[in-house]
UniProtKB/Swiss-Prot annotation:
Gene: menD
One Pfam family in the UniProt entry: TPP_enzyme_C
Needed co-factor(s): Mg(2+); Mn(2+); thiamine diphosphate
Any one GO molecular-function label of the UniProt entry: 2-succinyl-5-enolpyruvyl-6-hydroxy-3-cyclohexene-1-carboxylic-acid synthase activity
Lineage: Bacteria, Bacillati, Actinomycetota, Actinomycetes, Mycobacteriales
Pathways per UniProt: Quinol/quinone metabolism; 1,4-dihydroxy-2-naphthoate biosynthesis; 1,4-dihydroxy-2-naphthoate from chorismate: step 2/7; Quinol/quinone metabolism; menaquinone biosynthesis
Keyword Lipid metabolism assigned: no
UniProt-recorded name of the protein: 2-succinyl-5-enolpyruvyl-6-hydroxy-3-cyclohexene-1-carboxylate synthase
Cofactor binding remark: Binds 1 thiamine pyrophosphate per subunit.
């Protein structure tokens, strides 16, 4: 067995021993040893291989797989710009704490700076965005040297996995594993044994997950509201408290609508995870008169306003909430929900908020919901839901719209045996439409419905400062960015079934049995979004 083939097989074997079950592969010459090793493992049923031609979408496919499965997912690619195309997915994985592994093949390091083809300084390319950038030396010729190097290859692979999973830090995230490979890049005719790992399929270096436990004492006799953001953990001893939960947070037992915060005057706040969606929440967290306790699952905690009084991982509570406070919060919550329902029913045009209401109202227990990071995740936070036991995903690490179709496909591939619904805007869909390109030999989601709320542009800007009517003539072009893309034709190009339906038809369409991937397009209006949201606030 030639050195590069032996090295690649040892690395792939050790990844599998460390818990990797899905790998995304992009074609190339320099990463051929890894490609052959991954194909062999896929054929043997040891992992599931997903081949993609575009490294950017491949990265977000891996983000979806890793976020939904909780396991590290490598993306293997050749050298050069192939590596650079992982940049957006790496940044998202960093801030969302997703265990993504960039498995980058490289030229031998002596070729750096020589003008060699498809060669760049790619080790360390991602800088501070990765938990670690790890490399291993070139494999050397000869069976004795291969046996001598095998422990180093396997040990480095275990180090990569530990960094990606946050085993020693409680801070999962992306890692670059850069492997220089020398020719020959294809297996020998006579083959040979793979360098052996530990007996019984054990990893070369076992790294137990760290226990990160920082208790914080909190007295609940003060009027308390919980703000649960992206990445929030479940805290059973806080379940009785009024909770404003973003869609990606665990759904609360005692919910408070985000718009209801303007009707309430809490005396303290317990912040779980990283809230990013609502201006009412941001204003509350910035109020220096109100103590804020930040509870997170890792070493970092959000504190945009610098107002957190204490941080930790769990609350040690004393006292009980005032029943009158709980009643006021419940009343405000229902008043806000009634305001949303009432204005949706009387508004003359279909908006993205209407589409979100029909999608969320059609959800069933056991579903997985993927939300676009722009208006859809915000809309889903405002409307009533039809089920509580729903797994919700959204790329809220850095909240970009790029890669959302690929993320949804990855999440659906990891959500076996259940239904996945994705709600995204038209710009988000068009931006990552190449994520629909799945080869005929590749695994496909069993049941993924992508609902495209199509208002022909960027509806979120209608609700921001740029959407002020005095800027209409300018903003409609440079922020609204109408595109006139034929969604149905785009789907046909990728052999994906699609329908264009009304919002009233959306619920029944979602209830229909579905296989594979389908797209439901609902035409919406964004010109009256500002008016609709103002009417909802006025109804409070």
């Amino acid at each position: 067995m030639n050195p590069s083939t032996a090295q690649a097989h040892a690395v792939v074997d050790e990844l599998i021993r460390g818990g990797v079950r899905d790998v995304v592969l992009c074609p190339g010459s320099r990463n051929a040893p890894l490609a052959f090793a991954l194909h062999d493992a896929d054929k043997a049923g040891r992992l599931r291989l997903h081949v993609r031609i575009d490294e950017r979408t491949a990265g977000f496919l891996a983000v979806g797989l890793a976020a939904a499965s909780g396991s590290p997912v490598p993306v293997a690619m050749t050298s050069g710009t192939a590596v650079a195309n992982l940049g957006p997915a790496v940044v998202e994985a960093n801030y969302a704490r997703v265990p993504l592994i960039v498995l980058s093949a490289n030229r031998p390091y002596e070729l750096l700076g020589t003008g060699a083809n498809q060669t760049m300084e790619q080790l360390g390319y991602f800088g501070t965005q990765v938990r670690a950038a790890i490399s291993i030396g070139l494999a050397e010729e000869g069976s004795e040297k291969i046996e001598a190097q095998n422990p180093h290859w396997r040990s480095a692979t275990c180090r990569v996995l530990a960094a990606a999973k946050g085993s020693r830090t409680a801070n999962a995230g992306p890692v670059q594993f850069d492997i220089p490979l020398r020719e020959p890049l294809v297996p020998d005719r006579d083959g040979g044994p793979i360098p052996a790992g530990r007996p019984g399929g054990a990893p070369w270096t076992y790294t137990p997950d760290v226990t990160f436990d920082e208790p914080v004492e909190i007295d609940l006799t003060a009027d308390t509201v919980v703000i649960a953001g992206h990445g929030a953990a479940t805290h059973p001893n806080l379940s009785m408290l009024p909770t404003v939960a973003e869609p990606t947070a665990p759904q609360p037992d005692n919910p408070v609508h985000p718009l209801a915060l303007t009707l309430l005057h809490p005396q303290q706040v317990i912040m779980l995870g990283r809230p990013t969606l609502h201006r009412q929440v941001s204003s509350l967290l910035a109020d220096s008169r109100i103590p804020v306790y930040a509870l997170t699952t890792g070493p970092r905690w959000p504190d945009v306003s610098g107002n957190s009084q204490a941080t930790g991982t769990r609350a040690v509570t004393s006292g009980s909430p005032d029943p009158a406070w709980l009643q006021r919060c419940a009343h405000a919550h229902h008043k806000a929900l009634d305001a949303v329902r009432g204005q949706l029913s009387t508004h003359p045009l279909t908006t993205g908020l209407h589409v979100a209401a029909h999608v969320c109202g059609s959800l069933r227990d056991g579903d997985q919901l993927v939300l676009g990071a722009s208006n859809p995740v915000r809309d889903a936070a405002l409307v009533p839901w039809g089920a509580k036991d729903v797994r919700v995903r959204s790329n809220r690490g850095v909240a970009g719209i790029d890669g959302t179709v690929s993320t949804a496909i990855g999440a659906a591939l990891a959500h076996r045996g259940g239904r996945t619904v994705a709600l995204i805007g038209d710009l988000t869909f068009v931006h990552d439409s190449s994520g629909l390109l799945i080869g005929p030999t590749e695994p496909r989601p069993e049941n993924l419905t992508i609902v495209v709320s199509n208002d022909n542009g960027g509806g979120i800007f209608e609700l921001l400062e740029q959407g002020d009517p005095r800027f209409h003539d300018v903003s409609s072009r440079i922020f609204g960015t109408p595109h006139d893309v034929d969604i149905a034709a785009l789907c046909r190009a990728y052999h994906v079934d699609s329908q264009s339906i009304s919002v009233e038809e959306l619920g029944p369409a979602l209830d229909e049995p579905a296989r594979g991937i389908r797209v439901l397009e609902v035409k919406a209006d964004r010109s009256t979004l500002r008016e609709l949201h103002a009417a909802i606030r006025a109804a409070l």
